[in-house]
């Protein structure tokens, strides 16, 4: 299997993003987006997926975090898709249940080449909840769905994320990110029993 490494840069009038990703890493993570809670979530994602992940982002956080979070998620998805390459020899499917105190989240991944995202189960108060700030740039949890959609669509994977139950917005969001991390780790792992592309069609 060739090196599964990617580097993607994206610059707009709203942000400048660089993501470096090694799918066969050991969880070495260096994240700086200017949004502390989002840094925390991306660090958890890289660590629990055992990816080596570097994310450097500068955006118009003086307005709010939305553009930076959205654009970083787009570039992360692009890097994931690029690093996957021809997808030969991978497991393709992965899923994980992750508890965090009172919360339980589940994620399921299909590295299918058909982008789709289902995000369900978050309690209604996460539409209005904010984490962090005071001082610093706050993270509005309403963007959680958009993060996962952006990753899935740009990586061209099917990603389902659901919250079975939970109350605390920090615990819910973190459990979601960790569930996605563990599901991705399983899906992209080499399968010694698979030599080609894991599809009856012969391509993904």
UniProtKB/Swiss-Prot annotation:
Example GO biological process term? Answer: L-histidine biosynthetic process
Name of this chain's protein: Imidazoleglycerol-phosphate dehydratase
NCBIfam families per the UniProt record, alphabetical: PRK00951.1-6 (NF002110), PRK00951.2-1 (NF002111), PRK00951.2-4 (NF002114)
Cysteines engaged in disulfide bonds, as pairs: none
Which Gene Ontology CC terms are recorded? cytoplasm
Instruction: Give the enzyme class.
Output: lyase
Q: Which Pfam families match?
A: IGPD
- EC number(s) in its UniProt entry? 4.2.1.19
Its UniProt entry gives the catalysed reaction(s) as: D-erythro-1-(imidazol-4-yl)glycerol 3-phosphate = 3-(imidazol-4-yl)-2-oxopropyl phosphate + H2O
Q: Which domain of life is it from?
A: Bacteria
Alphabetic keyword roster: Amino-acid biosynthesis, Cytoplasm, Histidine biosynthesis, Lyase
Compartments where located: Cytoplasm
Pathway listed for it is:
Amino-acid biosynthesis; L-histidine biosynthesis; L-histidine from 5-phospho-alpha-D-ribose 1-diphosphate: step 6/9
Q: Which GO terms describe its molecular function?
A: imidazoleglycerol-phosphate dehydratase activity
Q: Which family does it belong to?
A: Belongs to the imidazoleglycerol-phosphate dehydratase family.
Q: Which InterPro entries match?
A: IGPD_sf (IPR038494), ImidazoleglycerolP_deHydtase (IPR000807), ImidazoleglycerP_deHydtase_CS (IPR020565), Ribosomal_Su5_D2-typ_SF (IPR020568)
